[in-house]
UniProtKB/Swiss-Prot annotation:
Residues given in the record as NADP(+) binding sites: K192, T195, D230, E391
Positions contributing to NAD(+) binding: G245, G246, D247, T248, G249
Gene of this entry: GAPN
Described function: Important as a means of generating NADPH for biosynthetic reactions.
Ligand binding (substrate): R116, N169, Y170, R297, C298, T299, R451
Enzyme Commission (EC) number: 1.2.1.9
Compartments it resides in: Cytoplasm
Entry-linked SUPFAM superfamilies: ALDH-like
Database matches in InterPro entries: Ald_DH/histidinol_DH, Ald_DH_C, Ald_DH_CS_CYS, Ald_DH_CS_GLU, Ald_DH_N, Aldehyde_DH_dom, ALDH-related_metabolic_enz
Transmembrane segments: none
Main location: cytoplasm
Catalytic activity: D-glyceraldehyde 3-phosphate + NADP(+) + H2O = (2R)-3-phosphoglycerate + NADPH + 2 H(+)
Protein name per the record: NADP-dependent glyceraldehyde-3-phosphate dehydrogenase
Length: 496
């Protein structure tokens, strides 16, 4: 159970502590933040409401710890990361339990997230040793007008203190995707977990604590965004921000100042289905891509753009698969579980009601109980409907019928988002042309959008983000280049 066994130190009474200076602490504020169980809609956990003074202290110790950590050999950093990964996977059950109760993630998917996170940490350790152990060597006479009198050596050095802000939907996986690259690169790390998912993150951080990382190197502060959110993102002690979430990231980017930013801010991932597509493959991918974890994924299929000539057949196949989806509590491993909050459910319902008023075709009856929304496919959606453009982050999927590939590409590119897209066709040449034309960070051919595997580059354009993720790219963006030039009195090739 959460807060028991090896995790007993992270809770006192009914409030989970925050992590600073290698210790679990109670906030001087004396206040806590409630975490509501999406299924019961009752308080499940409480976390500390940290103060700005406590944030200042965290930043101070993170700066000091980073200086020593940067001098720690790469192999030693990797060794500790491998140890943390093993501990994380060993204690997957209580962490998964938190995910079930905090964010209504189906039980099996919750376990998968923790195991995947451990694998990510281990892979990052290995990749970091490879890419950070290499540098570049340049000679001056490769540039016109120069003799070989200068040798240039370049290496990658840490940025300093990294601020990591993961989202609610994958709080553990998207936290470690920031933590592990930061640490292997020689940085210190301050984690601000989402409110929903905070307790799972605290358990994960304790696994790093048990692995024996130096005090102050990793910190985790919890609290209200209104009190410490801007204070964290604008803090002069932060040298890089890695954020995954919604349009809050736009505000962060405007306030952050001259530091590197890595941001993934959502998407309206389009699925284009052509006449020659394998409709069974497309239908299966659409249902999995659109309804997994109740559609609460940045890379979920958010709109289907299907050629009119095959639309009826595709919709029929999708509806048949939707009918087989199970609906209920996450403890029962249902396909569709409650969305994360009442406000999210209300937003989704607003999109549905707008589509209803504008005469979209409801392939299923709209049904909602509390935060639980039954899966819904909306056919004959038009561009004047909100659901055609806005990201529902729920189990509602619009279908827009198109008469040409160009029409589908135009709709995709007219979106303010540009995270991922996909195309289903048996013509690889046409698929590549469409991929080049789609204004998205990634295009999947004959598969639904997806973030993984975790070592693949992952990025969005337009309002979907800044920079690129994926293990290698994250390590690189959390470092800077250091150049050392050796100056010779005479060209090196003159001897002999």
């Amino acid at each position: 159970m959460a807060g028991n066994g090896v995790f007993v130190d992270i809770i006192e009474g009914d409030v989970f502590k925050y992590y600073s200076e290698g210790e679990w602490k109670k906030s001087a504020s004396g206040k806590s933040v409630a975490i509501i169980n999406p299924t019961t809609r009752k308080t499940q956990y409480k976390v500390q409401a940290c103060t700005q003074e406590e944030v200042n202290k965290v930043m101070e110790v993170a700066k000091t710890a980073q200086k020593s950590w940067a001098k720690t050999p790469l192999w030693k950093r990797a060794e500790l990361l491998h140890k943390a990964a093993a501990i994380l996977k060993e204690h997957k059950a209580p962490i998964a339990e938190c995910l079930v109760k905090e964010i209504a993630k189906p039980a099996k998917d919750a376990v998968t997230e923790v195991v995947r996170s451990g694998d990510l940490v281990s892979y990052t350790a290995e990749e970091g040793v490879r890419i950070l152990g290499e540098g570049k060597f340049l000679v001056s006479d490769s540039f016109p007008g120069n003799e070989r009198t200068k040798y240039c050596l370049t290496s990658k050095i840490p940025l300093g203190v990294i601020l990591a802000i993961p989202p609610f939907n994958y709080p553990v996986n998207l936290a470690v995707s920031k933590i592990a690259p930061a640490l292997i690169a020689g940085n210190s790390l301050v984690l601000k977990p989402p409110t929903q998912g905070a307790v799972a993150c605290l358990h994960m951080v304790h696994c790093f604590h048990l692995a024996g990382f130096p005090k102050g190197l990793i910190s985790c502060v919890t609290g209200k965004g209104s009190e410490i959110g801007d204070f964290l993102t604008m803090h002069p002690g932060v040298h890089c921000i890695s954020f995954t979430g919604g349009d809050t990231g736009v505000a962060i980017s405007k306030k952050a100042g001259m530091i590197p930013l890595q941001m993934e801010l959502g998407g309206k991932d389009a699925c284009i289905v052509l006449e020659d597509a394998d409709l069974d493959l497309a239908a299966g991918s659409i249902v999995k891509g659109g309804f997994s974890y109740s559609g609460q994924r940045c890379t979920a299929v958010k709109v289907v753009l299907v050629m009119e000539s095959v639309a009826d057949a595709l919709v029929e196949k999708v509806n048949a698969k939707v009918a087989k989806l199970t609906v209920g509590p996450p403890e029962d491993d249902c396909d569709i579980t409650p969305v994360v909050s009442e406000s999210s459910a209300n937003f989704i319902e607003g999109l549905v009601m707008d589509a209803k008023q504008k005469n979209a075709t409801f392939c299923q009856q709209y049904k909602r109980e509390g935060n639980l929304i039954w899966p819904l496919l909306l056919d004959n959606v038009r561009p004047d409907m909100r659901i055609a453009w806005e990201e529902p982050f729920g189990p509602v999927l619009p279908v827009i019928r198109i008469n040409s590939v160009e029409e589908g590409i135009h709709h995709c590119n007219a979106s303010n988002f540009g995270l991922q897209g996909c195309v289903f066709t048996k013509d690889i040449n046409k698929a590549i042309l469409i991929s080049d034309a789609m204004e998205t960070g990634t295009v999947q051919i004959n598969s639904a959008p997806a973030r993984g595997p975790d070592h693949f580059p992952f990025q969005g354009i337009k309002d979907s983000g800044i920079g690129s993720q994926g293990i290698t790219n994250s390590i690189n963006m959390m470092t800077k280049v250091k150049t050392t030039v050796i100056n010779l009195p005479t060209p090196s090739y003159t001897m002999g």
